[in-house]
From Swiss-Prot:
InterPro entries (UniProt xref): Adenyl_kin_sub (IPR006259), Adenylat/UMP-CMP_kin (IPR000850), Adenylat_kinase_CS (IPR033690), Adenylate_kinase_lid-dom (IPR007862), ADK_active_lid_dom_sf (IPR036193), AK3/Ak4_mitochondrial (IPR028586), P-loop_NTPase (IPR027417)
Main subcellular location of this protein, as a coarse class: mitochondrion
Residue list for modification N6-acetyllysine: K29, K34, K64, K80, K174, K189, K203
Catalytic activity line of the entry: a ribonucleoside 5'-triphosphate + AMP = a ribonucleoside 5'-diphosphate + ADP; GTP + AMP = GDP + ADP; ITP + AMP = IDP + ADP
Protein name: GTP:AMP phosphotransferase AK3, mitochondrial
Catalytic activity, EC: 2.7.4.10
Species classification: Eukaryota, Metazoa, Chordata, Craniata, Vertebrata
Task of the protein: Mitochondrial adenylate kinase with a specific GTP:AMP phosphotransferase activity. Could also use ITP as phosphate donor. Its physiological function is to recycle GTP into GDP which is necessary for the TCA cycle in the mitochondrial matrix.
Recorded GO CC terms: cytoplasm; mitochondrial matrix; mitochondrion
Length: 227
């Protein structure tokens, strides 16, 4: 299989809008590893009505955060199926208790931290507007409507999702920072934190790629389909 004999245990961290999803999918495309998104895992369990999915849904329905022990159970249960693979966790651990619980089960080798200035993220996230009737999405920077605030086809007004409003974005970013700073510090002290800073995903990616080349076998061209 190449690289080292020991399998890689890694996690990726980054604020909402940091490009974490894009970087994760590129990592999965280029390297031999399993990508485990805690958000996808949660949705899948809720959809299938598993015991832990039902439990998690009760918190979500009440507008509460899912407790650390529930998220930890969810992820550790899934990781049992991935013991023979290199893996990359995405969206977990999000808090210090989650990181400590993960540590008791697995030795984490690398934590990739995408450090994108909050101002850049705020611009990215608040640039999105939608046409409620059709679900058409516009981005003020990349594909703006012909007339500001108006849907191209119907002439109806565009709206901004609650999540994309500047005040909501700022609140989410501050909450992320408060929650994850202790986690980053925890991994920094362990000497496994690798921070990649920048304002554009396409400029950050080559550095992440070069770093992972030293840690992981690459997919051969014939098998480079996403697992």
């Amino acid at each position: 299989m190449g690289a080292s004999a020991r399998l890689l245990r890694a996690a990726i961290m980054g604020a909402p809008g940091s490009g974490k999803g894009t970087v994760s999918s590129r990592i999965t495309k280029h390297f031999e590893l399993k990508h485990l998104s805690s958000g996808d895992l949660l949705r899948d369990n809720m959809l299938r009505g598993t015991e832990i999915g039902v439990l998690a849904k009760t918190f979500i329905d009440q507008g509460k955060l899912i407790p650390d022990d529930v998220m930890t159970r969810l992820v550790l249960h899934e990781l049992k199926n991935l013991t023979q693979y290199n893996w990359l966790l995405d969206g977990f651990p999000r808090t210090l208790p989650q990181a400590e619980a993960l540590d008791r089960a697995y030795q984490i080798d690398t934590v990739i931290n995408l450090n994108v200035p909050f101002e850049v993220i705020k611009q990215r996230l608040t640039a999105r507007w939608i046409h409620p009737g059709s679900g058409r999405v516009y981005n003020i920077e990349f594909n703006p409507p012909k007339t500001m605030g108006i849907d191209d086809l119907t002439g109806e007004p565009l709206v901004q999702r609650e999540d994309d409003r500047p005040e909501t974005v700022v609140k989410r970013l501050k909450a992320y920072e408060a929650q994850t700073e202790p986690v980053l510090e925890y991994y920094r002290k362990k000497g496994v934190l690798e921070t990649f800073s920048g304002t554009e995903t396409n400029k950050i990616w080559p550095h992440v790629y070069a770093f992972l080349q030293t840690k992981l076998p690459q997919r051969s061209q014939e098998t480079s389909v996403t697992p």
